[in-house]
Amino acid sequence: FSKFQTNKKTSLSNVQNYIPIYDRFFSLNNTNYNSINLNHLWSLSDIKEKDGDKSENIFNCKLKNISDIEDFTMTQKVFFKMAPLLDPFKYIVGKYNHTDEHLFNLPSFDKSIRVHPKIEDTNNSSYIDGFFCFLTSQMLNSHSFIHGVDYYGSFLAIKNNYKVNIIDDLDYLITSE
């Protein structure tokens, strides 16, 4: 995942493997906490390029088959699902303290690093959503579940220039205090 740290195509920074929900499934320690991934069939090995101007989230990627001892790879269009750790609408209407210097800190295995409690919560909707994507991929690849989506891994990062479509929520934003 080190290639994602320097990839300017994604506009991501501070990319990390550690996700708090992993605390429920793995025995994490200071040496392994940032190298754990769920057991999925394909993983991202490289991001080649953004796929046109139609979407900020579709990339041509090199995928590696995890179970193949011959290191079989393929290139495919991949949708990157961006799931914010904090509700952007609550942020816009001022439900979060904008002056909190720890508001945008990513969670860490090192509990001395201060982060917003919602970001640290293993039940954060973004972590649950990512785990659900993993489970549907398992069903797709192991049980031919036709409504599953392929899962290539989860990472946490800061999305620079994050955009939110507020058109359907204008009434809420205008009337909220």
Enumerate the predicted regions with their spans.
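Conserved ATP-binding subdomain of kinase catalytic cores across diverse folds
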Residues: N37-L38, S43-E177
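Juxta-kinase regulatory segment immediately upstream of eukaryotic protein kinase catalytic domains
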Residues: F1-S67
